[in-house]
């Protein structure tokens, strides 16, 4: 290396280097504190006095801790995917209303099919629970038909068995007393008999849509989706809603199927299936039932904010109902699918899945036992339907307020019942009784709709703005300050550490690869200063100050040579001698 390059390298080495190229972390931190835009870090360096510097260190560390705490809260709030709710009020259309009679079939139509069942039931109840007659008479009259050799047709088809809790899987025949092994339950097959009830609409001269329900027979839906236009009302109150007088016909109630009298009503969307048996409201006879509605429409956010579905396409359960998706439809479809898989047939109260048949005792004699076992597992959430089915993200819910009043009153029934009987004409062959009638009023309490809409409480933009607010509040930082912090603490900081480690690794590798060199000969020494080594570089002032003093006791190895040129001789010495000699002569 040339002498000039060596001098330049030594000067560069001795000069202090700051900034990102600083050789140590201490110098880097000092440079950052002096040049950063944040206030606290600079005050730590420029403050004079130990107490003041300690105070600024405490203030700065406290501010940093508060920033980290607030930012952590913001991050946690962002990832909790919370929502905010906005409530709006607006007008909506009139909903669909489905009305069903509690009694599904006319008793006069199916009575001849149940004659044997009725007679044998009376005899069984008489033998089991007894009547006011004496015990001997009851025992003498019990099952006299059996002693005469008459076999009941109903018992011949379906045996009457007595089950004991201590003997599971076994039962005793009620007539013969013999024990039988039982693997399921058997009931009579239902007949396809439908009962159509008359209706009277007051205020709305419109036709109702017939709807057959498997549990309640013929039902009627008002303002259904099959209509050309969906009806709406322009005012709220009981006078501007649906008013219906229902003919219940209590005499035609089947005592073996129902034990109460009245009707059921359900309010739902036009594209929604009416689950009357689940959420229906019962209407009492001889009463006027007023139902005030208040509509709430909800819109929920899907993943990741909630476990809801938009249209049920992401739910692995096939919708067997001809209606829009809902949680109830999914649960019933799941149960019916499990019923077909495990029992081999479908339950009659729900729609039929593709390539399946309804259960009957000829082809599936043990289907009832399988049904009850499956229903018990469904209620205990062992089938997995509750975990698979999701709630709909958007749905409508009507909040109902029900009030009752006696109808018709004692004073008005004298003229009202004959008028209603005359209005029915040939459809009713008897004089109406008030227990055969029920009046229903359905109306909006007000025409305002409450809409509940979910929106993300924390978005990316709001998270960044909250970060900026916290940094600006506690340390007067901006985006530029954040970039400086990232550059110094996450780039330059680790770059210095990496350079130092790399330099150490190179030196270690060079020492390991270099061959062992012999001992260097003693460097030549000067005569006047034997400690000074001969170097190609020119001496500098700093290097001269660091040299050790010359040793005074050390004698040079060889005497200095005698040079004639160094001897001083006067040119006129001989002449002076000659002159002196001439004078002497």
UniProtKB/Swiss-Prot annotation:
GO terms for molecular function: ligand-gated sodium channel activity. NCBIfam families: ENaC. Pfam families: ASC (PF00858). It comes from Pan troglodytes. Belongs to the amiloride-sensitive sodium channel (TC 1.A.6) family. SCNN1G subfamily. This is Epithelial sodium channel subunit gamma. InterPro entries: ENaC, ENaC_chordates, ENaC_CS. It is a multi-pass membrane protein. A motif (PY motif) lies at residues 559-563. Glycans are attached at residues 207, 433. It comes from the Eukaryota. The keyword Nucleus does not apply. Keywords: Cell membrane, Disulfide bond, Glycoprotein, Ion channel, Ion transport, Membrane, Phosphoprotein, Sodium, Sodium channel, Sodium transport, Transmembrane, Transmembrane helix, Transport, Ubl conjugation.
């Amino acid at each position: 290396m040339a002498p000039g390059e060596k001098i330049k390298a030594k000067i560069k080495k001795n000069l202090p280097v700051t900034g990102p190229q600083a050789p140590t972390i201490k110098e880097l931190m000092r440079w950052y504190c002096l040049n950063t835009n944040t206030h606290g870090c600079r005050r730590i360096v420029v403050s004079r006095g130990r107490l003041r510097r300690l105070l600024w260190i405490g203030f700065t560390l406290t501010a940093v801790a508060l920033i980290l705490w607030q930012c952590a809260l913001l991050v946690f709030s962002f990832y909790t995917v919370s929502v905010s709710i906005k409530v709006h009020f607006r007008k909506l259309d009139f909903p669909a209303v489905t009305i069903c009679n509690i009694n599904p079939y006319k008793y006069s139509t199916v009575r001849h099919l149940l004659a044997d069942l009725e007679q044998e039931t009376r005899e069984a109840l008489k033998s089991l629970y007894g009547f006011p007659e004496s015990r001997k008479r009851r025992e003498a009259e019990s099952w006299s038909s059996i002693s005469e050799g008459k076999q009941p047709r109903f018992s011949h088809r379906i045996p009457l068995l007595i089950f004991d809790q201590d003997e599971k899987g076994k039962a005793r025949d009620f007539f013969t007393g013999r024990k039988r092994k039982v693997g399921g339950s058997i009931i009579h097959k239902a007949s396809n008999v439908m009962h159509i009830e008359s209706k009277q609409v007051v205020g709305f001269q419109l036709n109702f849509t017939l709807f057959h329900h498997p549990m309640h027979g013929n039902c009627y839906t008002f303002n259904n989706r099959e209509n050309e236009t969906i009806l709406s009302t322009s005012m709220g109150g009981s006078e501007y809603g649906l008013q219906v007088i229902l003919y219940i016909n209590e005499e035609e109630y089947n005592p073996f199927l129902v034990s109460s009298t009245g009707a059921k009503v359900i309010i739902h969307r036009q594209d929604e299936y009416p689950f009357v048996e689940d959420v229906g409201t019962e209407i009492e006879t001889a009463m006027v039932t007023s139902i005030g509605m208040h509509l709430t429409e909800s819109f929920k956010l899907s993943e990741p904010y909630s476990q809801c579905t938009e249209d049920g396409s992401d739910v692995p359960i096939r919708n067997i109902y001809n209606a829009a998706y809902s949680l109830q439809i999914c649960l019933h479809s799941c149960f019916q699918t499990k019923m077909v898989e495990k029992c081999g047939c479908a339950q009659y109260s729900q729609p039929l899945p593709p390539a399946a048949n309804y259960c009957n005792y000829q082809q599936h004699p043990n289907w009832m036992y399988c049904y009850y076992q499956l229903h018990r597992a469904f209620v205990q959430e062992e089938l997995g339907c509750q975990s698979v089915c999701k709630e709909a993200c958007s749905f409508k819910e009507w909040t109902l307020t029900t009030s009752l009043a006696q109808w018709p009153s004692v004073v008005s029934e004298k003229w009202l019942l004959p008028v209603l009987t005359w209005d029915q004409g040939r459809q009713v062959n008897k004089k109406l009784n008030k227990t055969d009638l029920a009046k229903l009023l359905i109306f909006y309490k007000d025409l305002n709709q409450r809409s509940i809409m979910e929106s993300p409480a924390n978005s990316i933009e709001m998270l960044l703005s909250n970060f900026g607010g916290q940094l600006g509040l506690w340390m007067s930082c901006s985006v530029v300050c954040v970039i400086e912090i990232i550059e110094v603490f996450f780039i330059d900081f680790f770059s210095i550490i990496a350079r130092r480690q790399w330099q150490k690794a190179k030196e270690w590798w060079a020492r390991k690869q270099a061959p062992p060199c012999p001992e260097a000969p003693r460097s030549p020494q000067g005569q006047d200063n034997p400690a000074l080594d001969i170097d190609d570089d020119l001496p500098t002032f700093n290097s001269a100050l660091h040299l050790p003093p010359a040793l005074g006791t050390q004698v040079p190895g060889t005497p200095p040579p005698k040079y004639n040129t160094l001897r001083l001789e006067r040119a006129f010495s001989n002449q002076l001698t000659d002159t002196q000699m001439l004078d002497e002569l």
